[in-house]
Amino acid sequence: MSARVSAFELEVLRSAFETIADELAIIVMRTSCSSIVRDAIDYSTAICDARGRTLAQGATTPLHLGSFHDAMRNLLATQGARVAEGDVYIFNDPYLAAGQHLPDIYIVRPIFVSGGLEGWATTVAHQNDIGGIVPGSNSIGSTEIFQEGLRLPLLKLFDGGRENAAIWDILAANVRVPDKVLGDVKAQLAACLVGEREFARLFARWEPERFRAACDEIHDHAERLARAEIADIPDGTWRFENHIDGLGDAPEPIPFRVALTVRGDEIVVDWTGTSPEVRAGINSPVPFTNAASWAAIRSVLSPDIPNAQGFTRPIRVVAPPGTIVNPRPPAACGARGITGFRMMDCLMGALAQALPDRVPADGSGGSTLPTIGGRHEGRPFIFVETIMGAWGGGMQRDGQDAVAHLGANQSNVPVEAIEAEYPISVERYGFVADSGGPGRHRGGLAIEREFRLLADEATLTVRSDKRRFPPHGLAGGRPGSGSLSVLNPGTPGARVLPVLVTEPVAMRRGDVFRHVLASGGGWGDPLDRDPAAVLEDLRLGRVTIEGARRDYGVVAVEAPDGPRLDDAATLALRRALRGAAG
């Protein structure tokens, strides 16, 4: 029988792989034990071919896009002939196993059909804890990976179907909340078992040679589509520079520099000039740097391109060794998420120059990650939250409010779940008026949240961003507002915390932690914003009467039925403001 596969058959098979990958994602969500996986959706799933190449990835975390590429390449290069039916691999180490950071545990299972290796079911999930010097294992202040928790090189959790009970024991002994961690790993294992079953069922419907040829063609097809899209981007080199605020109480800006070069149907992402690696937990191992770079490029290409590994072939990532985007062991990397988000934001800044109609102004940055851990009623608890922010305004519309960063696609933990599961009360959750970056199209609003501790004591760590360097606007739009973290706001003992907290903060019963995320930058001249849109923002409480006048030159007055525009005064004020601006 010919190995040739029709376009129709290829699309059916590709869709089947995507369905299986999404089914794995649903299984992990529905069977996991921790809120960081179940509610915040900090995990990913994928189906790979026999060579470990990603055929489809579940619709969860874009920053994990490609996270299986390096891991599977390393696994097959080092394990190769030792891979056997019934095996399950577990690993997390970025230096020994091409992982991303220690909290992200990979569970992968080879799929054998009729005695031959035909594919892989793969999962990665952020664990609530993996040991180390702070609860939640997201220490900014770590100076080397040995301080960050349990390192798992490539290990067989199951060897030919035989369970390695010692690994479970080691894992349980090294984490603060073993019930959560082991439960989530078992959820990943369950997903892989289902992936194996569904893949085998799909394989049985095909002639083996044609199935393998179709897998190759899925990669080739993704590559062709990506190249066609890249070819439509103007040739040239676009540069962008930005900074993370810095570390601790005396922060020094940490620069990120990217040169995005388009030549024909290929792209080079060059991070030369970016900060050297730092003695802190925000270094990005190169597999994560690759994933962040691919995800940014992928976001401006057609959604019809499959998330198969072939789409990465036209993209070359240059990450100089010894930098924050390619650290040398044993550099710490537990809180590397902020660096991934900043890399994506830098790339979007470069892409905005090449594709101004596709890229919005800068957003709030990655999710703020506060972690509160301690003991309550004799039991340990670790609360990890992903506070989501806003997108910048774009050429066509205002920025989105209260959504995940482009690279996250995650969610906050619902208030009801927090208060039911943890000794924490959510005191405040809402938008901050007048915070969105002014523009013809306004940036999304900042979000504020307050958490009150109900346990006797706990420790707090915070990973946030964009206070000193707030989100930039585009096309004449103004910057968004910066972030803020405060312990016990509005009290005589109020304490403003650093953007990146390097030393755990002690909390006592009744203490309140307040965080305000950065907002989105604006797009276009604020004086060109439709006054009717400003009026709608006034009615919804997104903008105040004072803010409308100050930021948009719109004059409104309060009335019994809500604010009303003063058209004549608005016209006069805008004329005066434009004249003053020259």
Regions found by a protein language model. Name each.
Residues 1-85, 90-113, 117-582:
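Glycine/proline-enriched, intrinsically flexible loops and inter-domain linkers
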